[in-house]
UniProtKB/Swiss-Prot annotation:
The enzyme's E.C. designation: 3.5.1.18
Gene3D superfamilies per UniProt: Zn peptidases
Protein name: Succinyl-diaminopimelate desuccinylase
Lineage of origin: Bacteria, Pseudomonadati, Pseudomonadota, Gammaproteobacteria, Cellvibrionales
Its job: Catalyzes the hydrolysis of N-succinyl-L,L-diaminopimelic acid (SDAP), forming succinate and LL-2,6-diaminopimelate (DAP), an intermediate involved in the bacterial biosynthesis of lysine and meso-diaminopimelic acid, an essential component of bacterial cell walls.
Residues at the active site: D75, E140 (proton acceptor)
Organism, as annotated: Saccharophagus degradans (strain 2-40 / ATCC 43961 / DSM 17024)
Length: 382
């Protein structure tokens, strides 16, 4: 394929159309309408699902059999300083084989590849086995309260079960398809308020310093071996992301300290075990505290099975390379789908520029990704 023809494929054209919509979370900016029009044209039945201020849709083709669902999001993160962009982030621009624009890699390029893969597959296999579905939201980059999690609840209420789920998050590191995510660590966040007694620094016996109170406990938590990981997951990590205390004055012992921390944890632990061990450390150090927890998602793992095999085979067939299975990185909406029993994988373009100024993706990679998705459909449903 020549450079010029690579730029004019249905995948790249659709990616450009989607990028041109300023769908900063939770706005969809008509991206879903564009996708729905393409899907209805090839026989999908679509149900629009609006929860709160969030647009979602569920589209399905086929009457019976196992469901292969493509999952993704139309919302993007804010652009940041527009003056630092080489091009307008919502004016898709191709330069030196790279497509620039907010959402190019995360994840409008994947959405375009999913649509065109289905168009190609259905043209070749109009009477395919099983069912193909799309679960699309505009609330992945934001609170993720009225998006995928609500659609999953809606599906469960109808007893609609996804067997295989392909999430289009940008999983690749250097070359498209070099890494697929077959699981993710859990994420447990906490907001800790340490209660002291405010006073004058010259009269410490009349004050209780919350910074001094919490410091030994935080040191122990930071040095603690929470687990040793396993063959699929690295060891659980503990990180303090925010620490605030003090009045701004140099002669006042603060009365309170606020600490925000996070665990990224493996399948060796549960959120409840982490909570218990945290409370035990705080209590051992006689910390006076309030603690609020936020579980963003439990860890999940898709072991060897049909979906892993299909993705590995498709990547090998289209690119000639062997892929790496990984559970590294942050959370995704796969965390809401995996607990239903579905096999979940993340496979998308290179993630080197996601959320950055001048976000971009290779146009060749988008075309390759569409071919990989189409081959996976053939492996599972032809």
């Amino acid at each position: 394929m020549t450079n010029e023809s690579a730029h004019n494929t249905p995948t790249v054209k659709l990616a450009c159309d989607l990028i041109a919509q300023p769908s900063v979370t939770p706005e969809d900016a008509h991206c879903q309408r564009m996708m729905i029009e393409r899907l209805e044209a090839i026989g999908f039945k679509v149900e629009n699902l609006r929860f709160g201020d969030v647009d979602n849709f569920w589209a399905i083709r086929g009457e019976s059999g196992p469901i292969l669902a493509f999952a993704g999001h139309t919302d993007v993160v804010p652009t940041g300083d527009l003056g630092k962009w080489a091009t307008d982030p919502f004016t898709p621009t191709i330069k030196d084989g790279m497509l620039y624009g907010r959402g190019a890699a995360d994840m409008k390029g994947s959405l375009a590849a999913m649509i065109t893969a289905c168009e190609s597959f259905i043209a070749a296999h109009p009477n395919h086995t099983g069912r193909i579905a799309f679960l699309i939201t505009s609330d992945e980059e934001g609170p993720a309260i009225n998006g995928t999690v609500k659609v999953v609840e809606w599906l469960e209420a109808r007893n609609e079960k996804i067997k295989w789920c392909l999430v289009g998050e940008p999983s690749s590191t250097t070359l498209v398809g070099d890494v697929i995510k077959n699981g993710r660590r859990g994420s447990l966040g906490a907001e800790l308020i340490v209660k002291g007694v405010q006073g004058h620094v010259a009269y410490p016996h009349l004050a209780v310093n919350p910074i001094h109170m919490i410091a030994p406990a935080l040191a122990e938590m930071a040095s603690e071996t929470w687990d040793n990981g396993n063959e699929f997951f690295p060891p659980t990590s503990f990180q303090v992301s925010n620490f605030n205390s003090g009045t701004g004055a140099t002669n006042v012992v603060p009365g309170e300290a606020n600490v925000v921390f996070n665990f990224r944890f493996s399948t060796e632990l549960t959120a409840d075990i982490l909570k218990q061990r945290t409370h035990a450390i705080l209590d051992k150090h006689n910390v006076n505290y309030d603690l609020k927890w936020n579980l963003s998602g439990e860890p999940f793992l898709t072991a060897e099975g049909e979906l892993v095999a299909a993705s590995v085979a498709a990547i090998k067939k289209i690119t000639g390379r062997d892929t790496e299975l990984s559970t590294a990185g942050g959370t995704s909406d796969g965390r809401f789908i995996a607990p239903t029993g579905a096999q979940v994988l993340e496979l998308g373009p290179v993630n080197a520029t996601i959320h950055q100024i001048n976000e971009c993706v290779s146009v060749d990679d988008l075309n390759t990704l569409s071919d990989i998705y189409c081959t996976m459909l053939t492996e599972l449903l032809a």
